[in-house]
Amino acid sequence: MEKHMKVVAFERQQQGTGASRRLRNAGKTTGIVYGGEAAPQMIELDHNALWHALKKEAFHSSILDLEVAGKSQRVLLRDVQYHPFRQLVLHVDFQRIDPKKKLHTKAPLHFLNAETSPAVKLSSAVVSHVVTEIEIECLPADLPEFLEVDLSKIEAGQSLHAKDIALPNGVALTAHVDAENPVIASATIPAGAVSDEAAAGEGETPAA
C-alpha cells in the first residue's frame, strides 16, 4: 500500500489579523485547504512540527495525507508564506487532489555524476545547475518525489536541456516547458583557467 507523509491539522474557527496573531503566539500556523468539489477549509497547524516538515524536500513535492478533524484528504503543498526575517511560517496553502485528474506541479531535480563527467575530469570545467526544479504534469499516482539528471556525459561547453531529463512513465513536461526546452545545467571552463592555459602555451619555447 502506498504511503504518504501525514500532516495533522485542526479546523480554524476564527479569522482575521488579530486571530492569526493570537494563533502564532500560541505556536500555531494558519492555513487553507482548497480545490476539488468541497468548499475551502480554514485550518491551523502546530508551527514547530510544520517548520521541521518544511525542511524535507519530499514535503514540497509529494502527495500528503492531511488529517483535519479526524478526516483524511490527499493534498499537495501549494504555497508557504514566511516571515521576512524571523524563523516563522505565517501561512500555508494545500490543494486537494483528484486521483483521476492530472496535476501540474514542480519536481525537484537531483543532479548526479558531474564529478565523473568529461567536463570535470578532462577539462576542469565547472558544472552549474541552472534550475533546481522543473514543471511537470502527471496523474497523482505517477508523481515522482524527484527527477534524476545524469551529468556523466556532459563535456566542457555543453548544456543539458529540459528534454534531456529521463522522465518516468506517466510523467511529462508541461506544455510551455516542453516548448521552451530551457537549459537546466551547463559546463563551463572558468575564465582564469583559460587565461592560465593560454599563458602557459605562450611561455613554451619552440623546439630547435
UniProtKB/Swiss-Prot annotation:
Role of this protein: This is one of the proteins that binds to the 5S RNA in the ribosome where it forms part of the central protuberance.
Keyword list, A-Z: Ribonucleoprotein, Ribosomal protein, RNA-binding, rRNA-binding
NCBIfam families: bL25_bact_ctc, PRK05618.1-2, PRK05618.1-5, PRK05943.1
Subunit structure: Part of the 50S ribosomal subunit; part of the 5S rRNA/L5/L18/L25 subcomplex. Contacts the 5S rRNA. Binds to the 5S rRNA independently of L5 and L18.
InterPro entries: Rbsml_bL25/Gln-tRNA_synth_N (IPR020056), Ribosomal_bL25/Gln-tRNA_synth (IPR011035), Ribosomal_bL25_b-dom (IPR020057), Ribosomal_bL25_C (IPR037121), Ribosomal_bL25_long (IPR001021), Ribosomal_L25_dom (IPR029751), Ribosomal_uL5_bac-type (IPR020930)
Lineage: Bacteria, Pseudomonadati, Pseudomonadota, Betaproteobacteria, Burkholderiales
GO molecular function annotation: 5S rRNA binding; structural constituent of ribosome
Organism of this sequence: Burkholderia pseudomallei (strain K96243)
Assigned GO CC terms: cytosolic large ribosomal subunit
Record-stated family: Belongs to the bacterial ribosomal protein bL25 family. CTC subfamily.
Name this polypeptide is given: Large ribosomal subunit protein bL25
GO biological process, one term: translation
Keyword Phosphoprotein among UniProt keywords: no
